[in-house]
Amino acid sequence: MGPPKIGQTVVVEVPSTTANIGPGFDCLGAALDLSNQFTIKRIEGNAERFELIMESTEGNHLRGGPENLFYRAAQRVWRTAGIEPVALEARVKLAVPPARGLGSSATAIVAGLVGANALAGYPLPKEKLLELAIDIEGHPDNVVPSLIGGLCVTAKTASDRWRVVRCDWDKSIKAVVAIPSIRLSTSEARRVMPENIPVNDAVINLGALTLLLQGLRTGNEDLITDGMHDKLHEPYRWGLIKGGLEVREAAKAAGALGCAISGAGPSILALCKATKGREVSVAMVKAWEAAGVASRAPLMSLQLTGSECISNTFG
């Protein structure tokens, strides 16, 4: 079979994500309304050629080539669909900063899957793309909401299948995400976690996750506050984030219902009513400034559509 004849250039938008949201370690994540845009183009050359063009200084350290996450994801689509690969160029308008706990790696994986699938004429269903995304990333909490949008719980069943459930999020609840200038890699954040956890800590998290999901569904402030409590990963990770605990306490004092490390960090998520958004944002930025860390703290909403192919040029 020759190269795909349908697509020449596709433009894909992929949202950022906040994962874990406190007690939902490696299973809970939400898509947010901050997105990366990927313009993906077939180019001349052998199938191993991949050119990456970053339209942001934040991504200057990222490189093309066979180890790039986008490239690996695109290749998985070709192989799975039985299609001969083609050389690609990806031009990225980067709005989601890397190594900040906002799912930047997930956006690359999802863009590679969705873009390659679109170029090939959509041979794979979204369910298969979900499976591939989780396999490449290694955990589902970022890639799943990045692909399908919304607030998602992803669990592995007794039959070793992934099951995804989209949960309700009351519109009155907003997310303030304090994004610092410092970086923290996911691998570093995972290294500090213990291999085993006490049963009591697991029980606390199970209860907290139930409270949080019910609070987000109904907009119940007390349930959100009681539910944003974690024993599995945050106690080990706060020490990696300079000024993080002070930022958390400042957000709560300003009216946040609860705070959590966003993904692996170092960004910090605060949930609040929309009327408290500005106060919480200002408080978090000031607290980080006092610790000698520059930051910004935009007020964000849930992104419901997930990744979208907004343009497909046929050639």
Swiss-Prot record:
The keyword Kinase belongs to this UniProt entry's keyword annotation: yes
Keywords tagged on the record: Amino-acid biosynthesis, ATP-binding, Cytoplasm, Kinase, Nucleotide-binding, Threonine biosynthesis, Transferase
GO cellular component terms given for this protein: cytoplasm
Catalytic class of the enzyme: transferase
One Gene Ontology MF term: ATP binding
UniProt record, GO biological process: threonine biosynthetic process
Pathway: Amino-acid biosynthesis; L-threonine biosynthesis; L-threonine from L-aspartate: step 4/5
SUPFAM superfamilies xref list: GHMP Kinase, C-terminal domain, Ribosomal protein S5 domain 2-like
NCBIfam families to which the protein is assigned, alphabetical: PRK01212.1-4, thrB
Entry function: Catalyzes the ATP-dependent phosphorylation of L-homoserine to L-homoserine phosphate.
Protein's UniProt name: Homoserine kinase
Top-level taxonomy: Bacteria, Bacillati, Cyanobacteriota, Cyanophyceae, Synechococcales
Gene responsible for this protein: thrB
